[in-house]
UniProtKB/Swiss-Prot annotation:
This is Asparagine--tRNA ligase. Pfam families: tRNA-synt_2, tRNA_anti-codon. Keywords: Aminoacyl-tRNA synthetase, ATP-binding, Cytoplasm, Ligase, Nucleotide-binding, Protein biosynthesis. The lineage of its organism: Bacteria, Bacillati, Bacillota, Bacilli, Lactobacillales. Transmembrane segments: none annotated.
Length: 432
């Protein structure tokens, strides 16, 4: 019986007859030959139907196929150096499953709003396919890395009574006559996991009610957040560098085809896989901006243009360390060498992409953390359970968070993070 294979497996079956189930993305004919552009969820390639090699019924069926028709085919795999994928199939038989007309996403140019309105169909196209395959590889690399480092996957709740960074940018929910919020971070609960299991990472959706229309913001996005007991800030930075360089290396190794679809210059990514990330102090970053004539003073937070300028000065990700206390959340540990700053760091991606990760050593002392909660104007009762972590067996500990879509946007060189998630949620979009 002829073997059923995926397009991705074609290289293992050159000059063999195989079966596939596929969808049609495009078609053209020239008299006695029909060229079919095919996809199956693993890759895209071309099928060729020659009138002299098939029955009249099969040839007419091929000519009558419409965009996104689904069908089974039988044929022989051949190498094809002209294609991204490197192979094509000479079709000898096909069996149509569905063949409706009127598919809305044709091969002409469409505006972004039209494509997002039809996101449920747009995901079938080459570009979204490549991005989602790279997203999947980054997820796999993330899980593999932390499992190999001895971390435990830990699940944080999405409904929260209190928030790690205040409630001004949270979605409020009436929870049986009580206030609740959609989580903007699993970090506080991640710290619980770290003191139970030593090293954990959370991964899941987070929500921020930011009225922002920038290319870097979504209202629903995914975060990966490790927390590590017995780890100081410098050790955390070492871990972050190993992690990010591993992820980029895995994408370069396994996603060459997808990166080629996107036209990504992989030479721009290779330095990130090598490590050796600069650790730039906040003070020095301020000086760089000022020397470039930017209107920026010590104590300001970096805006997107500032981050873009700084990231263009490096060929790989880099850290900005020790931010002022006034512009960071309450749970961070103060820098003993300068108590006006925290032991914290953001990771900035090159090529103008800016912040993709952020973390800190956490404040481990009960009285100090309590004072910082009060200074932030937060209700101590909401954080009583969090303070318990410092009351019973507190240890030095650190953690960080990675914005999944921002990393994908940088690696894929996307203009907007909305392309980095299957169904983007923004202030003006909740469907499909």
């Amino acid at each position: 019986m002829t073997e059923l294979i995926s397009i991705r497996e074609s290289s293992k079956h050159v000059d063999e007859e195989v079966r596939m189930h596929v969808w049609l993305t495009d078609k053209r004919s020239s008299g006695k030959i029909v060229f079919l552009q095919l996809r199956d969820g693993t890759a895209f390639f071309q099928g060729v139907v020659r009138k002299n090699d098939v029955s009249e019924e099969v040839f007419e069926a091929a000519k009558g196929l419409r965009q996104e028709a689904s069908f089974y085919l039988t044929g022989t795999i051949h190498e094809d150096a002209r294609s991204h994928f490197g192979y094509e199939i000479q079709i000898s038989d096909l069996e149509v499953v569905s063949n409706n007309e009127g598919y809305p996403i044709t091969n002409k140019e469409h505006g972004i709003d039209f494509l997002l309105d039809h996101r449920h169909l747009w995901l079938r196209s080459r570009r979204p396919f490549a991005i989602m395959q790279i997203r999947n590889r980054i997820f796999k690399a993330t899980v593999d890395f932390f499992e190999n480092e001895g971390f435990v996957k830990f699940d944080a709740p999405l409904l929260m009574h209190s928030a790690p960074e205040g409630t001004t940018e949270l979605f409020h929910i009436d929870y049986f006559n009580h206030d609740a919020y959609l989580s903007q971070s699993g970090q506080l609960y991640g710290e619980v996991g770290a003191e139970a299991f030593g090293k954990i990472f959370t991964f899941g959706p987070t929500f921020r009610a930011e009225a922002s229309k920038t290319r870097r913001h979504l209202t629903e996005f995914w975060m990966m957040e490790p927390e590590m007991a017995w780890m100081h800030q410098d050790e955390s930075l070492d871990l972050q560098e190993r992690f990010l360089s591993y992820v980029v290396g895995q994408v370069l190794e396994h996603c060459e085809y997808e990166l080629s679809i996107l036209g990504r210059d992989v030479d721009k990514l290779r330095p990130a896989a090598e490590g050796n990330y600069t650790r730039l102090s906040y003070d020095d970053a301020v000086k760089m901006l000022q020397e470039a004539g930017k209107d920026f003073k010590w104590g300001d937070d970096f805006g997107a243009p500032d981050e873009a300028f700084l990231s263009e000065q490096f060929d790989r990700p880099f850290f900005i360390v020790n931010y002022p206390v006034a512009i960071k959340p309450f749970y961070m540990k103060k820098n003993p060498e300068n108590p006006l700053t925290y032991l914290c760091a953001d990771v900035e991606a090159p090529e103008g992409y800016g912040e993709i990760m952020g973390g800190s050593e956490r404040e481990a002392d009960y009285d100090t953390l309590k004072a910082q909660i009060e200074e932030a104007g937060l209700n101590l009762d909401d954080y009583s359970w969090y303070l318990d972590l410092r009351k019973y067996g507190s240890v030095p500990h650190s953690g960080f968070g990675m914005g999944f879509e921002r990393v994908i946007a940088w690696i894929c060189k996307l203009d907007h993070v909305r392309e980095a998630v299957p169904f983007p949620r923004m202030i003006n979009r909740m469907q499909p």
